[in-house]
Swiss-Prot record:
HAMAP family in alphabetical order: UPF0262
Species of origin: Bradyrhizobium diazoefficiens (strain JCM 10833 / BCRC 13528 / IAM 13628 / NBRC 14792 / USDA 110)
The protein's name: UPF0262 protein blr1257
Superkingdom assignment: Bacteria
Lineage of source species: Bacteria, Pseudomonadati, Pseudomonadota, Alphaproteobacteria, Hyphomicrobiales
Family (UniProt): Belongs to the UPF0262 family.
Length: 165
């Protein structure tokens, strides 16, 4: 028995992701590396089901900042528009700030600190990343269904975007 399109997740996935070049903040090689890995991992395995799309993916996603909002421009693989979601950046500001501070500490630590100190900082970094991922999942509720791993990878991409505030 086949599942109805809205329950069959085989097409509920992202096959391409782009970031708005004007939204990308300045970053060093460590952040660029994380971004490349997040995009690769996201495309390799994800669950991304826009509400109302009835499993008619796969999808492409363009992420950017417009005004004070995070923009998710979702399209079908052939470029046909599905929906554009604008999410307030407010819930992410403190999390992203904390994430960058701990990432700075982590990148400094991996060059000079003991393995125990690196592990402790990395645990804190993962905890803040998980918090951002859960916040993103909550903000997308009723708009786009994503699993936790997809949300984690999307949050990584959000952190490389630049916004004022």
């Amino acid at each position: 028995m086949t599942k109805p399109p809205e329950q069959d997740d085989s097409n509920n996935r992202i096959v391409a992701v782009t970031l708005d070049e004007e939204s990308i903040g300045r970053s060093g090689p460590d952040i660029e590396h994380e971004r490349a890995i997040a995009i690769y991992d996201l495309i390799e395995q994800n669950l991304f089901a826009p509400e109302g799309a009835d499993g008619k993916g796969p999808f492409t996603l363009h992420i950017g900042i417009t005004g004070n909002r995070l923009m998710f421009d979702i399209r079908r693989e052939d470029g046909a528009p599905v929906v554009v979601h604008l999410l307030s950046l407010g819930p992410f500001r403190g999390i992203v700030k904390d994430y960058f501070m701990i990432c700075d500490s982590y990148y400094q630590a991996i060059r000079t600190a003991t393995p125990d100190k690196i592990e402790a900082i990395d645990m804190g970094r993962r905890g803040i990343h998980d918090e951002g991922s859960r916040t993103l999942q909550e903000r997308l509720k009723g708009k786009v269904r994503v699993d936790f791993e997809t949300s984690r990878r999307l949050f990584t991409l959000i952190t490389v975007l630049h916004w004022k505030g």
